[in-house]
Amino acid sequence: MKLETKAQGLRGSLRIPGDKSISHRSIMFGSLAKGVTTVRDILRGEDVLSTMQVFRDLGVTIEDDGDVVRIHGVGFDGLKAPQNKLDMGNSGTSIRLISGVLAGQDFDVEMFGDDSLSKRPMDRVTIPLRQMGVEVSGQTDRDLPPLKMHGSKSLKPIHYELPVASAQVKSALIFAALQADGESVIIEKEKTRNHTEDMIQQFGGQLQVEGKEIRISGGQTFTAQEVVVPGDISSAAFWLVAGLVVPNSKIVLKNVGINETRTGVIDVIKDMGGKIKLSDIDQVAKSATITVETSELKGTEIGGDIIPRLIDELPIITLLATQAQGKTVIRDAEELKVKETDRIQVVADALNAMGADIVPTEDGMIITGKTPLHGAEVNTFGDHRIGMMTAIAALLVQDGEVDLQRAEAINTSYPSFFSDLEGLLHG
């Protein structure tokens, strides 16, 4: 598709679609609780719809009237063997977390996904699950999907140090540990997003978190809850950057989730000199209104323990860095290579094709700015965040057209992205 270029300014306010991580987990915990859980402001992107369908296939009744999602929970012991293979679509969150849920189920399942998901390594989940007594096998020595699995009603507790900083792996092991005989200990490499831990407590469960160590006992039960999903900061990040780099812009984003394990992008924007303000802060819901406006930006260094707090925002942060004076160095981000695409290479290739100066490295990128951008053809390779990054980059293009291939990937996490963009262009 041909993208909008030569933006004269973005102005207006937006309510960001629901957080993808919390939307996935609300369906999972609602299914595993006893009673009817209601979820408002859920994200209806393709990934979350995949999770919803998988739990229906496992025997859970889920109603969606377009406003509220009602989940008739069955508990861990009420899940039923599916009639068919479980389709995870493009969703790494779905296949990894649901592997943990199914670890304690005494039936056969096969989980598969699209071409992109079929290239993502699952060994980081399958290795510890095997240690707990799960039979699971994938393709190649990295256990690529499809995965065949048979869980166990007598899961062994685990003491496990995560070799990578991954909220998905951590969450998969937490779901398995909730079904194990005894106490499990999971030790993170770096602190990652903690929505799973938060929701265990919200649904009446217990766990202990001390620093990077999580202790969790098996045999717990959950009680249905009312969940309101805040806006997704990963989706908001595209508008935060757009408001900073497009001339004559001021954007107000309402009800954005500001869980402290997810706000690295805000820290980086402040560090680069961006004009950003948080207001209407709700400490209970962990949400706020965020306002940004066009800013003069400077390069920075991004690495270490901030990386898990902004891993999904690094593509759009890279675009931000192309519009900052000086050099920006991103390091310790090798996890980008096993996302929907190799995001180090694909981001660098896409923005360099548009005139940026980006050198990919083993674990990140070196970006030299400020560079004007020009038209090019860019392929998302099925990666939603590459698509949205390119659409924001196109707004800065004064010369030529930007042709985005496979733009439909954006529906994975933000189906209303282009209509929201139109609103800001005419705000």
From Swiss-Prot:
Example GO BP: chorismate biosynthetic process
Active site (record annotation): D312 (proton acceptor)
Enzyme nomenclature, EC number: 2.5.1.19
An MF annotation (GO) of this entry: 3-phosphoshikimate 1-carboxyvinyltransferase activity
Family matches, as Pfam families: EPSP_synthase
The family this protein is said to belong to: Belongs to the EPSP synthase family.
Protein name, per record: 3-phosphoshikimate 1-carboxyvinyltransferase
Protein source organism: Streptococcus thermophilus (strain ATCC BAA-250 / LMG 18311)
Gene: aroA
